[in-house]
Amino acid sequence: MAKPVVAIVGRPNVGKSTIFNRIVGERVSIVEDVPGVTRDRIYNSAEWLGKEFNIIDTGGIDLSDEPFLEQIRAQAEIAIDEADVIIFITNGREGVTDADEQVAKILYRSNKPIVLAINKVDNPEMRDQIYDFYSLGFGEPYPISGSHGLGLGDMLDAVRAHFPKEEEEEYPDDTVKFSLIGRPNVGKSSILNALLGEDRVIVSDIAGTTRDAIDTTYTFDGQDYVMIDTAGMRKRGKVYESTEKYSVLRAMRAIERSDVVLVVINAEEGIREQDKRIAGYAHDAGRAIIIVVNKWDAINKDEKTINVWTEDIREQFQFLSYAPIVFVSAKTKQRLNNLFPLINQVSDNHSLRVQSSMLNDVISDAVAMNPSPMDKGKRLKIFYTTQVAVKPPTFVVFVNDPELMHFSYERFLENRIREAFPFEGTPIRVIARKRK
């Protein structure tokens, strides 16, 4: 099941980004120091009382070309469309403003749970000023201070109470769930329609457990699949449609419910920063990934074109070095018949468990070939390695001191594991822990 989505909404200068950063905390930091992993600060993962959720800072979406009220309306629309719970931020120092009332009118029609928070209530004396905010019609307001971190616990308790009840996926374990993600107009819908052609047995179109998503279930060559639609493939005409950052938000839920993610790139437009943002989220979520270059029929080519494109993709998506690349045309159906076998392959690799004895032989040989460097007179000592999870395959390396496991050596071990076992298409995790 996808994580609940929480959106932070409010007029400018009420402190939305400060509260966003407070809630996500250290999760804002870049996890991997690899070129090409682009972070977008408008969304992130957070956790409260053991429950993980995604949080959107609508104020981070660039709508500077729009009139003021249109910006507010666009933020509210994004929250209404995407969120399970909305945090409505106001400013306690300024009281209720006309802009607050404009936001309230839009949110009030949403039928979504609204948690009203009054920011910049930095001392107890200011709490007497909160009563005016009852007029906005969202019940008890929560006085908070984003800059000092005050009151956030009570606010998050209220947010968590509104999370939807968890539902189990209704599909058998051997069903492969995949999604096509990408910027607007890269051809996701065209690929989907071409895939659901005459050779496919379409079982049903049913509403998914995630709001506004359609799960298309079908069978091909005896294998059951679920194509998890991003809502953006079926909805058009919103005021924020031209805002490319928004395509990341639409992809988040589909990615989390998928086993395999097909990152679709438009060959006519080339690789854009937004392609890397979307792919980075799928990578961070630990999903199996295939890079699909669509509209291959629409560009001029010679015998070197595929190699040039492949080199460019490998350079710009260095964090996806494991992902296979397929050049397709939804229009002519060129190479589309390669997609299902590849989806099956990377799905199998995503779930692969390796024997501990073979794994430890690989690690021992790697250490013998390239011992870890000394650090302040100490050397990393590896005692043993075990696989602790799949989807993605995750390995714990028990060592004398995890601080001695440098990122470069961790990457070296990952590469040796990849050389020894079939992990094409899936990220793998290598974690150092101190042996007890």
Curated annotation (Swiss-Prot):
<dbReference type="GO" id="GO:0005525">
    <property type="term" value="F:GTP binding"/>
</dbReference>
<feature type="binding site">
    <location>
        <begin position="119"/>
        <end position="122"/>
    </location>
    <ligand>
        <name>GTP 1</name>
    </ligand>
</feature>
<dbReference type="InterPro" id="IPR032859">
    <property type="entry name" value="KH_dom-like"/>
</dbReference>
<keyword id="KW-0547">Nucleotide-binding</keyword>
<feature type="binding site">
    <location>
        <begin position="229"/>
        <end position="233"/>
    </location>
    <ligand>
        <name>GTP 2</name>
    </ligand>
</feature>
<comment type="subunit">
    <text>Associates with the 50S ribosomal subunit.</text>
</comment>
<dbReference type="InterPro" id="IPR027417">
    <property type="entry name" value="P-loop_NTPase"/>
</dbReference>
<feature type="domain" description="EngA-type G 2">
    <location>
        <begin position="176"/>
        <end position="351"/>
    </location>
</feature>
<dbReference type="InterPro" id="IPR005225">
    <property type="entry name" value="Small_GTP-bd"/>
</dbReference>
<dbReference type="InterPro" id="IPR016484">
    <property type="entry name" value="GTPase_Der"/>
</dbReference>
<dbReference type="Pfam" id="PF14714">
    <property type="entry name" value="KH_dom-like"/>
</dbReference>
<feature type="domain" description="EngA-type G 1">
    <location>
        <begin position="4"/>
        <end position="167"/>
    </location>
</feature>
<keyword id="KW-0677">Repeat</keyword>
<comment type="similarity">
    <text>Belongs to the TRAFAC class TrmE-Era-EngA-EngB-Septin-like GTPase superfamily. EngA (Der) GTPase family.</text>
</comment>
<dbReference type="Pfam" id="PF01926">
    <property type="entry name" value="MMR_HSR1"/>
</dbReference>
<comment type="function">
    <text>GTPase that plays an essential role in the late steps of ribosome biogenesis.</text>
</comment>
<dbReference type="InterPro" id="IPR031166">
    <property type="entry name" value="G_ENGA"/>
</dbReference>
<feature type="binding site">
    <location>
        <begin position="10"/>
        <end position="17"/>
    </location>
    <ligand>
        <name>GTP 1</name>
    </ligand>
</feature>
<dbReference type="InterPro" id="IPR006073">
    <property type="entry name" value="GTP-bd"/>
</dbReference>
<feature type="domain" description="KH-like">
    <location>
        <begin position="352"/>
        <end position="436"/>
    </location>
</feature>
<keyword id="KW-0690">Ribosome biogenesis</keyword>
<feature type="binding site">
    <location>
        <begin position="294"/>
        <end position="297"/>
    </location>
    <ligand>
        <name>GTP 2</name>
    </ligand>
</feature>
<dbReference type="GO" id="GO:0042254">
    <property type="term" value="P:ribosome biogenesis"/>
</dbReference>
<dbReference type="InterPro" id="IPR015946">
    <property type="entry name" value="KH_dom-like_a/b"/>
</dbReference>
<keyword id="KW-0342">GTP-binding</keyword>
<feature type="binding site">
    <location>
        <begin position="57"/>
        <end position="61"/>
    </location>
    <ligand>
        <name>GTP 1</name>
    </ligand>
</feature>
<dbReference type="GO" id="GO:0043022">
    <property type="term" value="F:ribosome binding"/>
</dbReference>
<feature type="binding site">
    <location>
        <begin position="182"/>
        <end position="189"/>
    </location>
    <ligand>
        <name>GTP 2</name>
    </ligand>
</feature>
<protein>
    <recommendedName>
        <fullName>GTPase Der</fullName>
    </recommendedName>
</protein>
